[in-house]
Amino acid sequence: MAGWFELSKSSDSQFRFVLKAGNGETILTSELYTSKASAEKGIASVRSNSPQEERYEKKTASNGKFYFNLKAANHQIIGSSQMYATAQSRETGIASVKANGTSQTVKDNT
């Protein structure tokens, strides 16, 4: 099964999206947006930037866990991954975002 985006509204009326893999696991979480239209633009940005290796910023947290940020051409963070125990599992996460990030399916939960 292919991946999809889920768009939601927080209790303080901000918007965020997540990218889900075909197995339902969240593989990328966006920042908060003040409008639904801005969140939808963020989804479009994931679609255009996720296939490009150079858009992934690989990081190590202070606790030694690995994660990545997906960035737009202007270097703004579009979304961040979960924390991974190993650098290899982070690479698997990046591959999953590349494979699912061009999905046209959006489940609107707002």
UniProtKB/Swiss-Prot annotation:
Source taxonomy: Bacteria, Pseudomonadati, Pseudomonadota, Gammaproteobacteria, Enterobacterales
A Pfam family matched in the record: DUF1508
SUPFAM superfamilies per UniProt: YegP-like
Family under the similarity heading: Belongs to the UPF0339 family. Duplicated subfamily.
The entry's keywords: Repeat
Protein name: UPF0339 protein YegP
InterPro entries xref list: DUF1508 (IPR010879), UPF0339_domain (IPR051141), YegP-like_sf (IPR036913)
First and last residues of every Sequence repeat: 10-58, 61-109
